[in-house]
Every structure is written in structure tokens, then in C-alpha cells.
């Protein structure tokens, strides 16, 4: 998918990942090219790349933030390198802190600085996607278009010699985020937002495939979704990370649509619509009904609407609460029993000690050595008793 050269550590990481997952994967051309190009890096970049290749992410962060050689690197480029490092380390939460910093940092119209700033913003969008927060991903992209009206045109002209995320990958991220997070009733309105006009001019997948959903052509949509789209996503390092959950979410969105308009529907019908086996559809619908607390039951091949019964719901709740209460009471009984045993043991120990002291007082007076010896023993016993309490 990538046209140009990948950021070298990412190319290596991507190569390692796909080699471990797909036995027939061949080393990427970008990786071979970069292994030669990297020798011409500045000294600081060679050092940083070396640390990233060794997965020394914490050291890389310290190096970017504090090494003297980084003082000549612009603020947005340093920020870009920091965000890249956190993403390579899958430390997505740390990236969120950069949003407020970028929003308060002034920028100039200098091309290199603007390019680094745009990539920082795109990396933040990528980060929301990798966190699985697709609606946030869309919101950030729309806001970025509002802030930079010619954003898509600028993205197309960004340098191609150090790519961390390609334009195509970013456009697909926006597309799948919209498809899974925008309600079906609002999808047509979203696609026709004025802010997205330039996006559609350069990338028409969202408009084209979204129209299939809007027109209820689900079989045609899922034929593309489970074939061309799946194949594409599984060849992309970032899209592949979220594809399984995204694909399942898209299907559950369709199930919810049908359950909303029907009181009885066949699993085999849904299986045909989404293009996967009945077994998988049954599992996913069962999960959807359970997690969303929907009033449906599955009987063989039929999904049937079950009218809400307050009495039955109350009985189920009381039964659940009774089980929970019984478990807690049983736990308290065990704790009380254990406490009673400990108290009885301590009482017996103290009684025995008192009896020994009483017996000793009736005997002949002790000399000085016996007194000190007994005192040491008593002290040890008292200390042990304190710890046992």
C-alpha cells in the first residue's frame, strides 16, 4: 500500500510482525531500500534508529528529549519522533498528552514545519484508531479539516522519503471508523458533510461503499468487506491490528439493524446477508443479545422477540441477588469461624502462661542469674505474642 519509503524502524517492525504471522510473507522492498539509505542518516538519527530497532523505547524517549544533538531539530519534528516512538511501543495512552501541547504551539507557514505539524496531527488520529475509539478518530479528522481547509491536498504533497503512515492507510482508517461508529440513520448525512468534499475527491471508498449500506445492499457491501477490504487490511500493519474487532463490530451493527425492524428472523437469512457461516452468526448474535440486554431469544434457526416481562425480570434479579448474598454470607461465616479459632488459641495460650507464672511464684526465690534468664524468655514470649495478635 505504501508508495515511498517507510520509516526504517517501522519497516523492520512491520517485517518482523508479518513474518511471524504469515509464513509465506516476503520481505518488503521498502525494507531492503532503507537498509542502504539509513547509512546516510545524520548521526543523531542513526543512533535513534539503532535504539528503536533494539526496542529500547524508554531510552529513545530520553534521547529525543534531552540529547544535545537534538537541540537543532525543530519542535514539531521532535514531537513527531516522540509520538512515533510511543506508537511503536503500543503506548497509546501517552500519546494523548501531546494533543494539548500541539494545540498551544504556534506554527509558521514554513513547508517543513507545516509538514511535521500535519503528521503530528495525523499520528494523533492514528492513535485514537489504535485505541479503538473510532468516533474520536473521526472527530479529530473533521476538526483538522476545519482548521486546515486544504488538508487533503497538503497530505498528498507531503514528503515520501520518511513515511510512518501512508495517506491511503489514513484514508482507510477514516473510512472504517465512519462505517463502524456512525449510526446507520446518520451515515448519509455524515458522508455529505461539506468538510468531507475534498476527502471524497481523493478517496471515494467511503462514499461508494457507504451508499451500499444506505441503500440496504448489505450482501454486496459484505462481499466487498470480507474479500477486498479484509485482504487489504491484513496487508497493512496498522489496519491489521484492529481488523478482527472492526469486522465483527460491522456485522453486529447489521444484526442490530435487522433486530430493530423485525420480531422474528432466521439466522440463516442473516448468514446469507453478511456472508459468513451460521455458526459464527449464532455466536455473535448471542453475544450481542447478552451484552446489549436485548429482548430476544434464539430457538434453533429463529431469533424471536420476547416481550419484556417485569415480573420475570424481577425474579431473575432477585435470584441473582440471592446467590450473591448467599456467597457473601458464606464468606462471612468462614471468616468468623477462623477468627473464633484464633481468639480461642490466644486465650488458651494466655491462660497457660498465667498458670506457669502462678506456679513459679509459689516456688523458692530465684537467684540473680535465674531472674535474668527468665526475663529474657518472657520478653521473647511477649514479642512473639504481639506478632501473633
Curated annotation (Swiss-Prot):
InterPro entries assigned to the protein according to its UniProt record, in alphabetical order: PCI_dom, WH_DNA-bd_sf
Disulfide bond residue pairs: none
Function: Component of the COP9 signalosome (CSN) complex that acts as an regulator of the ubiquitin (Ubl) conjugation pathway by mediating the deneddylation of the cullin subunit of SCF-type E3 ubiquitin-protein ligase complexes The CSN complex is involved in the regulation of the mating pheromone response. PCI8 may also be involved in transcriptional and translational control.
Matches recorded under Gene3D superfamilies: 1.25.40.570
Main location: cytoplasm
Oligomer status and interactors: Component of a COP9 signalosome-like (CSN) complex.
Compartment annotation: Cytoplasm; Nucleus
Top-level taxon of the source organism: Eukaryota
Occurrences of domain PCI (ranges): 143-312
Assigned GO CC terms: COP9 signalosome; cytoplasm; proteasome regulatory particle, lid subcomplex
Gene: PCI8
Transmembrane segments: none
Protein name, UniProt field: COP9 signalosome complex subunit 11
Keywords: Cytoplasm, Nucleus, Signalosome
PROSITE patterns named in the record: PCI (PS50250)
